[in-house]
């Protein structure tokens, strides 16, 4: 099934019902004295978005893109108010960003700022002539019509909700890592871009503690100008509490790990400077491919050259080296920052 994380929908609220014009005979001179008793119409139905944690893609909206609420009924005689139009509730994944398509103005992040959000308000009811009656039972203004409901074109963007986000160059071992520690099963192979869509995995530390981790396709130089796959999916890192930058310590193309880190950080900054400000750990992967002293020398060179003040870890996803220790550190970090 195709992974859909961006789509357009149209929402149409219901129109308000018209007010009723009717008269009740009053007294003996019924032909001259008529008491207005027409009632108001009903309000039009609203269109709401509802964040549902059980939905994880926008695939449904690929073939369902127009949502209409019910119209309010017109008022009737003898004080019978028109029935309100039926609301429409549209379920979207937790973490869906909602914007106006034309202006890109943000309406809200579902599940982050809003669990329930009105995106199109129904039209107001019209007034019946009973609303305008006077003490003389004379009505100059007979009635008013209901107003038209709102009509909106919306852009829905899904931002995956994860505690931890993984990024790096293609073939840095991200997918192997997430396969080992979680229930997610991304494709793993010895060629670039084996990860074509984001993956979510749940990492169970013990019976009580767990975290959610997101793996996005690899980022390459020039990604901020449209090259590669990863830039489109960087938005899925925006809600993460911590980022893990995976580095291949022994690249098969003999590229410099230091230059690779600088390249990726530059692309991240071009996309969104707020991502660069997030807590980030360097994860030096594939240490099994080098002798211990060589690996340590390369890592120390990178750390000193970058003047890196954050945490860093050396692991081997294939041999499970230091993986458990890293996961425990991640869990402690999340718990500390969640409750602080």
UniProtKB/Swiss-Prot annotation:
Positions of disulphide bridges: none
**The protein's Enzyme Commission number:** 3.6.5.-
Single Gene Ontology BP annotation: ribosome biogenesis
Compartments (UniProt record): Cytoplasm
Q: Which cofactor does it need?
A: Mg(2+)
Q: Where does Mg(2+) bind?
A: 175, 195
Top EC class for this record: hydrolase
Where is this protein chiefly located?
cytoplasm
State one Pfam family annotation.
GTP1_OBG
Residues annotated as domain OBG-type G: 162-335
Q: Which NCBIfam families match?
A: Obg_CgtA (TIGR02729), PRK12299.1 (NF008956)
Name the UniProt record assigns to this protein: GTPase Obg
Species per Swiss-Prot/TrEMBL record: Blochmanniella pennsylvanica (strain BPEN)
């Amino acid at each position: 099934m195709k992974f859909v994380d961006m789509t357009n929908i149209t929402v149409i609220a219901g129109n308000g019902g018209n007010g009723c014009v009717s008269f009740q005979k009053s007294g003996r001179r019924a032909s001259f004295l008529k008491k207005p008793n027409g009632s108001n119409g009903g309000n039009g139905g609203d269109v709401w978005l509802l964040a549902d944690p059980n939905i994880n893609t926008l695939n449904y909206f690929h073939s369902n893109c127009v949502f209409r609420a019910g119209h309010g009924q017109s008022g009737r005689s003898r004080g019978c108010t028109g029935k309100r139009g039926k609301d429409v509730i549209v379920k979207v994944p937790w973490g869906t960003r909602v914007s106006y398509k034309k202006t890109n103005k943000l309406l809200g992040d579902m599940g982050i700022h809003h669990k329930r959000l009105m995106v199109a308000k129904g039209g107001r009811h019209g007034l019946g002539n009973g609303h305008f009656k006077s003490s003389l039972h004379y009505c100059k203004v007979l009635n008013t019509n209901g107003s038209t409901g709102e009509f909106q074109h919306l852009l829905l963007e899904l931002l995956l909700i994860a505690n931890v986000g993984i990024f790096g160059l293609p073939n840095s071992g991200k997918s192997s890592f997430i396969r080992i520690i979680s229930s997610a099963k991304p494709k793993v192979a010895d060629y670039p871009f084996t990860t074509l869509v984001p993956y979510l995995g749940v990492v169970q530390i013990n019976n009580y503690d767990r975290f959610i981790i997101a793996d996005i396709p690899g980022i390459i130089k020039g990604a901020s100008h449209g090259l590669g796959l990863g830039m489109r999916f960087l938005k899925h890192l925006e809600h993460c509490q911590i980022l893990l930058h995976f580095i291949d310590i022994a690249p098969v193309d003999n590229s410099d790990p230091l230059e690779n880190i600088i390249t990726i950080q530059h692309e991240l900054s071009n996309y969104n400077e707020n991502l660069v400000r997030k807590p980030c750990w360097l994860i030096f992967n594939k240490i099994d491919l080098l002798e211990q002293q060589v690996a340590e020398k390369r890592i120390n060179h990178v750390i000193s050259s970058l003047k890196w003040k954050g945490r860093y870890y050396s692991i081997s996803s294939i041999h499970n080296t230091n993986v458990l220790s890293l996961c425990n550190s991640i869990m402690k970090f999340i718990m500390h920052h969640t409750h602080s």
